[in-house]
A protein has these predicted regions:
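A short, N-terminal "cap"/entry segment at the start of jelly-roll beta-barrel domains
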Residues: 1-31, 35-36, 44-45, 126-131, ...
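Amphipathic alpha-helical segments enriched in hydrophobic/aromatic residues interleaved with Lys/Arg
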Residues: 2-13, 113-169, 173-174, 179, ...
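N-terminal regulatory/effector-sensing and dimerization cores
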Residues: 27-124
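Residue at a beta-strand N-cap/secondary-structure junction
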Residues: 64, 71, 210, 259-260
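N-terminal positioning helix adjacent to the helix-turn-helix/winged-helix DNA-binding module
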Residues: 138-141, 166, 188-199, 235, ...
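Basic/polar phosphate-binding segments, predominantly the helix-turn-helix DNA-binding elements
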Residues: 169, 173-179, 186-188, 204, ...
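Short, amphipathic alpha-helix enriched in basic
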Residues: 198-209, 236, 250-257
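…primarily DNA-binding HTH/wHTH and HhH modules…
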Residues: 253, 257-260, 268, 272-317
Length: 317
């Protein structure tokens, strides 16, 4: 009996799909809403970036992310779950021209997660840790959903009909998985994590404005001490340090993309004193703004400025 070719062919692996579709170095968006692919051919220096709520998978290679004092490495058998927007440091650990680093991330829609949490209230596990970042084992069902999402790139005519269904399936599987409580806490209006997530999104939008912690705590119906405690539990940073990270990372993006000089960048992100800006810039990035700019362009690193998850973030939106 002859086996039809369509049945005989093995479905492509995630590595094969990303090899085919992640054709450019750095980050690239795709025709599938919320799906982004990444390719690198060399290990990288640490990159300061803002991760938004998402799941991240590595098909080939390894990556390291740092949140506060914690370092998390992940590879092909792992899943990185980001439940709130966080300023992080990330670097590629393993990559070469013969064996490139291949990865992807899928944006998580809080509205979808919230709807699923209401629709399936009995299936979510306990909340567990408040931390907004975790590396966990990649479950086969989650891997299968992500694989089918990426395979839609082979049949773009099916994306409008099938992508929303697969994204819903992925959200459900994450919600009922080992870290589902973390996602549920993100969207439960009465929960502390949701209140902190609301404050974080406000900080991301208003990073260049004066920080008034007392008012922010009142706005999310928390005491100042409780707000500080839960904010650090979620982000590993105090509200002030969180805002400084956002400001300095946006200033760095402005400098490296040549959209502003040092003084202009410092004022645009909310600093009143360029000298204070330069001191804090050196403390975070290990070099003064001018030294960093020279080093960046001399090292041919300008092309690594991509988009959310893998780049210096653009906080203008």
């Amino acid at each position: 009996m002859t086996v039809p070719p369509v049945l005989a062919a093995q479905p492509p692996t995630l590595t094969e799909l990303l090899t085919r579709h992640a054709t450019r170095l750095g980050l690239q968006s795709t025709a599938v809403p919320g799906l982004h692919l990444y390719r690198a051919v060399a290990a990288s220096e640490p990159v300061h970036t803002v991760y938004t709520p998402s799941v991240c998978l590595v098909a080939q290679g390894r990556k390291l992310v740092q949140q506060g004092e914690a370092s998390l490495a992940y590879g092909p058998e792992d899943l990185l779950l980001v439940s709130v927007s966080l300023p992080l440091t990330a670097r590629i650990l393993e990559a070469s021209p013969d064996r490139p680093h291949l990865a992807l991330h899928v944006d998580l829609d809080p509205a979808l997660i919230a709807a699923l949490a209401v629709e399936f209230p009995e299936t979510a596990p306990g909340a567990g840790s408040q931390a907004g970042l975790v590396v966990t084992a990649l479950e086969p069902l989650v891997q299968g959903a992500v694989l089918r999402l990426v395979r839609l790139l082979d049949t773009p005519q099916h994306i409008p009909a099938l992508a929303p269904l697969i994204l819903r399936e992925l959200g459900y599987l994450l919600l009922v998985g080992p870290e589902g409580g973390r996602l549920r806490a993100m969207v439960q209006a009465a929960g502390q994590t949701h209140r902190i997530a609301t404050a974080i999104e406000r900080l991301v939008r208003e990073y260049d404005r004066p920080l008034r912690v007392e008012q922010m705590a009142r706005d999310v119906h928390m005491s100042v001490s409780g707000f500080h405690h839960h904010f650090k539990a979620v982000t590993a940073l105090s509200p002030l340090r969180f805002q400084k990270r956002l400001r300095l990372q946006e200033a760095r993006r402005l400098l490296l993309s040549r959209e502003a000089d040092v003084t202009g960048a410092s004022f645009r992100v909310g600093y009143d004193s360029p000298s204070q800006f330069s001191r804090e810039y050196r403390r975070l990035f290990g070099a003064s703004p001018r030294e960093d700019l020279t080093r960046w362009h001399a090292g041919g690193l300008a092309g690594t400025l991509e988009s959310p998850q893998f780049k210096e973030p653009d906080l203008r939106r």
